[in-house]
Design a protein with these regions (language model features):
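Phosphate/nucleotide-binding beta-alpha loop and adjacent structural elements of enzyme active sites
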Residues: 1-228
Length: 228
């Protein structure tokens, strides 16, 4: 057996542990309660809309504390699914959100594999787009959002809050969900205003056709509620 190989694995394991400890307890102070964890109060808005704890799905979750729309919900007894391309992000979620289902995958229109570009110097990027300044890549599994949910304990449970932040792939995430089965009660999604205005955006048009009502705008994040 190669002793150096096993020694390297042990070192990497402990380095990851210390990184996660530093990130959660020193850098982001997980033990300190905050009134808001999202970028512009999206989490507070959603929490006030629901009287009882619900079920969330966070696609492009990135970090359990930093600019996260679901951590405040988790602290208020909500539970859900967190999905991200970044392996380290999911390991941090497994520590900080042990009662959630945390998945290292990409969401796409069909099952397959995706080439995922990142920068070794800056850390993993959530972009699926090839950039000259992101020369390194991994191959990651991808699937439809409804198929991913189907493989969890939340199968066929209606989504109370769907949060999407996937750098321009938001419409693909929405199209990969079976709205008849999962039918989210509320959705937070990025819409970058074009010169024509947000009402011309494909995400806005898609959700309006699905019988959603725009109820709030938090910077580039738009919150929609399903009409009764």
């Amino acid at each position: 057996m190669n002793i150096n190989f096993f020694l390297k694995k042990i070192i990497i394991k402990y380095l990851k542990f210390f990184y996660i400890f530093y990130d959660l307890f020193i850098r982001h102070k997980i033990f300190i309660n905050k009134k808001c964890y999202s970028q512009a109060g999206e989490d507070v808005f959603i929490l006030n809309k629901f009287k009882k704890p619900g079920f969330y799905v966070d696609v492009g979750c990135h970090h359990p504390l930093r600019i996260n729309n679901c951590h405040l919900l988790y602290k208020n007894k909500w539970r859900g699914i967190n999905i991200d391309l970044n392996k380290i992000s999911i390991e941090i979620f497994n520590f900080a959100r042990a009662e959630d289902v945390n998945i290292n995958m990409a969401v796409s229109l069909k099952k397959g594999k995706i080439k995922y570009y990142y920068n070794k110097l800056l850390g993993l990027s959530n972009s699926l787009l090839k950039k000259k300044y992101l020369p390194h890549f991994d191959i990651i599994n991808s699937d439809r959002l409804d198929k991913i949910i189907d493989r969890t304990k939340f199968k066929n449970r209606r989504i109370d809050f769907l949060s999407i932040d996937v750098e321009g792939k938001d419409i693909d995430v929405l199209k990969s969900l079976d709205f008849k089965r999962y039918n989210p009660r509320s959705i937070c999604v990025e819409i970058w205003d074009s010169k024509r205005g947000f009402k011309k955006h494909k995400v806005y048009k898609f959700l309006i056709k699905k019988n959603y009502l725009l109820v709030a705008k938090k910077r580039e994040n738009y919150i929609f509620i399903k009409k009764i």
